[in-house]
Amino acid sequence: MSYQEIKSIVALVSTLLINGLYGWYVFWRYQQEAPGVAELFRFWAVAMLIFMGVALVAQILITVVFRAAYRRITGETEPSFADELDRTIGLRATRNAYYAFALGLVVALLTQVLSLPPVALFATMFLAGIASEVAQALTQLYYYRRGV
């Protein structure tokens, strides 16, 4: 397996793990606090802002650990350049991530058109973010395996 394939798998697993654990924690807290209508938007705003920080720090730590482990296990350093193939795959993965997030955003807005509770809006937006990261990692893995 190439460095890029392993990196895509690590990104996919870490995304699912970080988002899954944080999502479980937030929904557990939501049930414990049972915020009323007045506090609902504040609850979700705080939860999402904290998540951005937690996810950023976790991704940085995972990247550092991955690079160190890769270097230690294989004895190779990660490629210091990106060729045309890497750029093309990166662009396609980013495009698919945007599509996944845009679709999730439309579904989130539809929850309000259908008069679902506001928690459905926030949960759908949270899931759209996860779907976009997963789409990006899967697209990269697919194209590194199959080729462009």
Each PLM stretch: what is its role?
Residues 1-31, 138-148:
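Cytosolic-side membrane-entry/anchor segment at the start of a transmembrane helix
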Residues 58-76:
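Membrane-water interface of transmembrane alpha-helices
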Residues 121-148:
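Alpha-helical transmembrane segments and their immediate juxtamembrane interface regions
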Residues 77-97:
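Short membrane-interface loop/juxtamembrane segments of multi-pass integral membrane proteins
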Residues 98-118:
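Alpha-helical transmembrane segments and their membrane-interface junctions
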